[in-house]
From Swiss-Prot:
Disordered: annotated span: 1-49
Residues that span the membrane, as ranges: 62-82
Annotated organism of origin: Homo sapiens (Human)
Membrane topology value: Single-pass membrane protein
Protein name: Uncharacterized protein C3orf18
Locations listed in the record: Membrane
Keyword annotations from UniProtKB, A to Z: Membrane, Transmembrane, Transmembrane helix
One GO cellular component term: membrane
Length: 162
């Protein structure tokens, strides 16, 4: 049991185990004797101020570790950015698989169609006014043949307000 306590005490304490006889004051000699200790013997503090060369090495080590952490962080951010970009590209392809949209081309077609629609409406009005002057009336189904056009935003707005 004592060997277990001594070994446990050795693990948990940095001091060697002491017995009670070590704790009692020594009374071998006369009590009037004094011992003088030199300053070197009483100094237990072994801490020294680091020299300048050791300080720059510590700063270099700190900067190196900071640099490594920064590079790892940038690499992780780059990987996440690439994954996000691929995911958005995949989603875009899923949403419009067979459709290639070019807004400039679409705008040109829309403008051309609006111009043609305006000309068609003007020609219908002119034909109606000419027929009214001549005294002939036509039903809308007998009017000039118009080519079917796409539904445009103005047509939708006019239909809503009508």
């Amino acid at each position: 049991m004592n060997s277990r306590t001594a070994s446990a005490r050795g693990w948990f304490s940095s001091r060697p185990p002491t017995s009670e006889s070590d704790l009692e004051p020594a009374t071998d000699g006369p009590a009037s004797e004094t011992t003088t200790l030199s300053p070197e013997a009483t100094t237990f503090n072994d801490t020294r101020i680091p020299d300048a060369a050791g300080g720059t090495a510590g700063v270099g080590t700190m900067l190196l570790s900071f640099g490594i952490i920064t590079v790892i962080g940038l690499a992780v951010a780059l990987v996440l950015y690439i994954r996000k970009k691929k995911r958005l590209e995949k989603l875009r392809h899923q949403l419009m698989p067979m459709y290639n949209f070019d807004p400039t081309e679409e705008q040109d077609e829309l403008e051309q169609e609006l111009l043609e629609h305006g000309r068609d409406a003007a020609s219908v009005q002119a034909a109606t006014s000419v027929q009214a002057m001549q005294g002939k009336t036509t039903l809308p189904s007998q009017g000039p043949l118009q080519r079917p056009s796409r539904l445009v935003f103005t047509d939708v707005a006019n239909a809503i307000h009508a």
